[in-house]
């Protein structure tokens, strides 16, 4: 017993003497310290172009810490609970480093998840907001920002994630879709990594400005839902962007499905075959309609310039011909066509296009789609979906107005006859039954005012401090500025809002308002009961886990309640930092003595 008492005391002494490595991103700061254990310890940045400050400090008996930048101390405490060697990469004046967002359930039993891409890349971690720093020649940067040409800038890009830092040289950086007539002043951007460099098995990254959506959640949420549906949709997450140390705001970082970077990651887990299949970007008119004797009828399918053997849009002809010649009511004929085209996951995409009123997608608009032919899967074609900004009621123009949400999917074929793939597929009784099963089960457990709203509110609360920063930025490029205010970021969850600059911006539906109304309409049509508690994905034992609900928290004073405790930053401290931090030498000693104490007792 005496030995156990000595061990416990020794354990306390060693724990209190621990040295912790602190890591913080502090834009526009040069003098950064950590305040802990009654002292302020200076942190340093190894790269003058990246405000990423690190350093070690003795924590003693302290339970909390905070950062000081330019003499200004953070107004809140950060918890040291669970941190034994290094903090995550904190961001100055952001109380939550790492969240605990509720995950969505998997509503489809058959092939519930897409597994060919492997585990989710850490760069798309739901619970962390990465910071992206690009540095290039200042005159070139100023030209691109002020004059918005299609010019590319070569420079250095640093990507700071939760517990790692990636840095790349010779990165090609520029405006995505430069020169379009209706671009926003907050431009969209992209970058291409050099040579064999990759990040998360990708080399091409797109940053969407999300200016159509005051909440800046809809497009990311759409991808979240599609992943829960077991599809190969593009990954997406919010990042902060800085160009030559100037803040440009929050952006949705996502795959561009028209690039082989996306195909390599989502279809081959970073290990593509020696020869890839042809990839196509579906512009307006990309509808899968057969054009006998007129190969130019497929010109809406824009071929990727890197397609093997230079395969152009003519490659769509055999697929469209086969669909045109299929007897849609015949199960055998449908089964034969499925050897050529993945109909099952195509239906999953269509379920979500319908539920979100994706007017700028395939079913309603025959646009913003794509196609890929996979040489490793008997040359099967896969439908691709993209650009999810016109969803959940954004810019929705329908003669019924708000009553459009009551329109049944059964009316879509007559309203949107150009979508020949889904419309003809629904002529098959078995496929129609499968579609309805996917639709109703998705609404019952996921797409409703219980489960999905639970995630929306948690995500909103987590992102809110950064959205306040984003709304404060005066964009430097020419283009449309709707003038959305920070208050409208929250208001548009619950109700429609009008752009202050009266120059467009169609946010006539609140995001949660839309979800609740659409779910109720489908539930009424099919007489289904929506879950009463939020549902999560299957747990390790095979049962369906309940999703955590957003907790009440301290008011931020301006945009709602901050629901995620700042102690969430300790939830991932077991992961070893790759930014150069070394594990505290006291950790093995603590573990050994703890074990000894337990044995003695």
Swiss-Prot record:
Annotated signal sequence is 1-17
Q: List the carbohydrate attachment sites.
A: 28, 85, 170, 324, 449, 527, 541, 554, 561, 571
Q: Which UniProt keywords apply?
A: Cell membrane, Glycoprotein, GPI-anchor, Lipoprotein, Membrane, Signal, Virulence
| GO terms for biological process, alphabetical | adhesion of symbiont to host endothelial cell; adhesion of symbiont to host epithelial cell; symbiont entry into host
InterPro entries xrefs: Ig-like_fold, Spore_coat_CotH_CotH2/3/7
Which segments carry the region annotation Disordered?
Answer: 539-581
Q: What does this protein do?
A: Promotes invasion of host epithelial cells by adhering to receptors on the host cell surface to facilitate endocytosis of the pathogen into host cells. Binds HSPA5/BiP protein on the cell surface of host nasal epithelial cells.
The molecule here is called Invasin CotH3
**Species of origin:** Rhizopus delemar (strain RA 99-880 / ATCC MYA-4621 / FGSC 9543 / NRRL 43880) (Mucormycosis agent)
